[in-house]
Amino acid sequence: IALKGTVSKPLLEALNALEFYNLPPPKSLGLEWVQNEVFSTIEAFDLDVKQILRTVVEHCAIQISTVLNSHHLQNGLITGGGVFNSFLMQRISALYGQEIPPTNSTLIEYKEALIFGFLGVLKLKNDPNCLQSVTGASRNHSSGSIYFPEKHRKRV
């Protein structure tokens, strides 16, 4: 759908101007921040879905390629769900100025399952799974919820 849209320059400029991108690491994008900052920025513009999606893809590609270029990386892996978006990956490659080799889908899915399983184990043990040193949060904490089947109903 994004491929069929056009970039809205005013929306792109507004998204790229969000203060988060000027903060030094460590930092992490949280769902709440996306809902409050990104969605409200998008809603301020009267655009159709194709134009919004095309602009958001460009925004993501700009932000990711900026970080890649700032570190002068010679190689690496891009993982996570966004890697399955071939249009996003094309835009990142174009802005990065290098071809980004595809990552094996099994590796991506395994990594995601392993990480979220580990976060769940930490949650069950009531150990921090969100570290201040990684995310920039004000403190270490245990994030997320675990839901058990009805037979073993218990909410942690």
Name these PLM-found stretches.
Residues 118-131:
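A polyampholytic, Gly/Pro-enriched intrinsically disordered region
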Residues 61-69:
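A short, acidic, amphipathic alpha-helical segment used as a generic capping/interface helix at domain edges
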Residues 50, 76, 104-106:
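Membrane-interface transmembrane-helix boundary segments in multi-pass integral membrane proteins
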Residues 1-61, 73, 125-126, 135-156:
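Conserved ATP-utilizing enzyme core subdomain
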Residues 93-115:
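Conserved phosphate-binding/catalytic loops in two-lobed NTP-binding clefts
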Residues 33-40, 86-97:
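Acidic-glycine-rich active-site phosphate/pyrophosphate-binding loop
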Residues 73-92:
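Glycine-rich phosphate-binding loops at beta-strand->alpha-helix junctions
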Residues 106, 132-137:
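Short proline/glycine-enriched turn/loop segments at secondary-structure junctions
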